[in-house]
Amino acid sequence: MKLFFLKPLYFTLICLLFLSCNSEPSLQTYYVDHQEASGFIAMDFPVSFLDIDINDITESEQKAINSIQKFNMLGYSLKSGSDIVYKAELNFVKQLLKEVKYNELFRLGNSKDGRIKIYTVGEDHNMDEVVILLNSNQVGFAVIRVLGKDMNLSEIMQLGPLIEKLDLDYKNIDSFFNFMKPSTL
């Protein structure tokens, strides 16, 4: 008799579970769905992976680094994929970035050399995500996500020269960029 009353409870819990799942496409689900797909390369790493010596940086740089939690990088290479898939996937990512939460910060480039667009989630002094979309009709596209908590845009921008000085070759990040290099004919 007890079992009879438990069945509606289990059924209700299962229904609530399915209803609570967000079936809307998002940049996160796109990343997860494509990280092992043909033509794609993906890398995730925490900010500690950069191995920055805190004694060699300013207080502002330290605050910026502490606000970053991790990086996600996803790339589609034309040398490993096709032009048709490239265009379709790039358009899909662009549609995802039209979501209200993404604020386009700026864009650079042209259709010949390639384009860069930078998006943020949150206010300039209180961001949770920075998204960099790079695309080239000769190479492919890449989406780089910087995820964190209360990131400050001006402090994050100051990290550019610091990151350029890092020796990232030994950390296998070069495999991502080599994958994204154009093929030579």
Question: What do the PLM-derived regions correspond to, one by one?
Answer:
Residues 22-25:
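Bacterial signal peptide processing site
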Residues 153-185:
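C-terminal partner/receptor-binding element of secreted or periplasmic proteins
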Residues 28-95:
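Early exported N-terminus immediately downstream of N-terminal targeting peptides
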Residues 1-10:
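Bacterial N-terminal signal peptides that target proteins for export
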Residues 17-20:
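C-terminal motif of bacterial Sec signal peptides marking the signal peptidase cleavage site
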Residues 75-83, 143-148, 162-164:
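Second-shell loop/turn segments in exported
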Residues 93-149:
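Surface-exposed, polar helix/loop patches in the mature regions of secreted/periplasmic/lumenal proteins
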